[in-house]
A protein has these predicted regions:
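Short, conserved loop/turn and helix-capping segments at secondary-structure boundaries
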Residues: 16-19, 61, 113-116
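Short Gly/Ser/Thr- and Asp/Glu-enriched loop/turn motifs at secondary-structure junctions
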Residues: 42-44, 84
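Conserved short submotifs of the Hanks-type protein kinase catalytic core
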Residues: 44-56
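ATP-binding glycine-rich loop module of kinase domains
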Residues: 1-20
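Conserved HxN/HPN-centered segment at the entrance to the catalytic loop
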Residues: 24-42
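C-lobe/activation-segment region of protein kinase-like
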Residues: 98-160
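Residue-level recognition of conserved beta-strand positions in structured domain cores
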Residues: 1, 41, 50-51, 102
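Conserved kinase catalytic-core helix
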Residues: 26-32, 55-93, 98, 119, ...
């Protein structure tokens, strides 16, 4: 959506770059083994992708563990989701598999801090934290990231 508060040419450039970036992240996530919508076409300001018919998961223990595994795969590929919460996961009505959606705030980064913020964001949103962490531990550098999550948590508590 165009932003009226931004100068027209700048707005068009930003929206176009963000559209291409999201499409690339979706493709990269799929290559990393993460279930997500398939990009069918990329226009200047829109992405046409496959439709995942389903519902938001309850994030029980099993789903939380799987969400942790999926984030581990994203982080192995240095993909930062940017808004990794249950609202951006869909349980397929057909297969029951979990799909990650909405990479609009995502980016590529090797930075442990960026990965820790992704983990922290999900941990704040779910009850089954231990299951999520158990799934995330399939990431080779999970210990380093989880240690940083504690630092992020302290900063957030202090800021509030």
């Amino acid at each position: 959506m165009p932003k009226r508060y931004r100068e027209g040419a700048l707005d068009a450039k930003l929206r176009s770059e963000r559209t291409r970036s999201e499409a690339k992240l979706l493709h990269k996530a799929k290559l990393a083994g993460v279930l997500c919508p398939t990009v069918l076409e990329v226009g200047e300001f829109e992405i046409t992708m496959s439709f995942v018919d389903g519902t938001r998961p309850e994030m029980d223990s099993k789903e939380s563990r799987e969400a942790g595994r999926m984030l581990a795969k994203l982080h192995e590929a240095d993909i930062i989701h940017g808004d990794y919460t249950p609202a951006n996961i869909i349980r397929s009505g057909e297969s029951g598999a979990l799909y990650v959606i909405d990479f609009g705030l995502g980016f590529v980064s090797k930075d442990v801090e960026d990965k820790a913020v992704d983990v922290f964001t999900m941990l704040r949103a779910i009850a089954e934290k231990d299951a999520f962490v158990a799934g995330y531990c399939s990431y080779g550098k999970a210990d380093e990231v989880l240690k940083r999550v504690k630092d992020v948590e302290k900063r957030v508590r202090y800021a509030v």
